[in-house]
Amino acid sequence: NMEDHSLTYVDGTLLARNNVYVLADGAISLSVTLADDVLPVLALEDVVRDVRGGVIHNYPLVKIGTQYWMRSNLEASLYVNGDALPKLNQVTANIAGYLQSTTEHYFYTANVALSGRILPTHWSIPNWEDWNILKDYLKGEASLLKSGIWLSLKTEEQVQPATNLSGFNGIPVGMYVGAFQADYENKHLAYWTLDNTNATIDTKVFYMKSDTNIIEESNAGIDTKAFAIRCIRK
């Protein structure tokens, strides 16, 4: 259903099958005879294999509704051509590079996110249309995206659930604001978001926090902030 981006299950007429076979001529079969020439096949998890400068990083995938997402944040210290990204200690205006928290989460400045040199082939930084499709499919429930341990913003505030039933694996890595990151970790999660022209960073970024079960937005603050990148396949 392209209107609400959902799938409807229709009962089949065939018996349940536990095996799929690939024949020597390339045909796919659900059953074989002794005379068939069957190829040995190694089934692998659906992953993105990102190779940069001799370093291989595998990103598992998740399908949510009609969308395909990486199931973890981008973790690259090199551009796709192998050139090194500058490693930074703080965010300042017009700077390009990446930052790492003490727990080794990766954050990128706006100039890197817009460079066109950081993402694996066929993968994109989501725009608000992409996020809204995801949000509508999950009926706005942030808990379905949240994973890991979320801590309260204030002592008296309640932490909302993190069920990760979608498989998105949204860990509260926080963000960098200037030189500060630790205060935001385990409480916040934000991702760089393009505007709907896909040519520039939107004024708002995708955002979740521990005390609400709502998928929100936050000011991008491109001169002072660095966020994680979560990729979508288009």
Which residues fall in each region the model found?
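Conserved positions within compact, well-structured domain cores
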Residues: 19, 23, 29-234
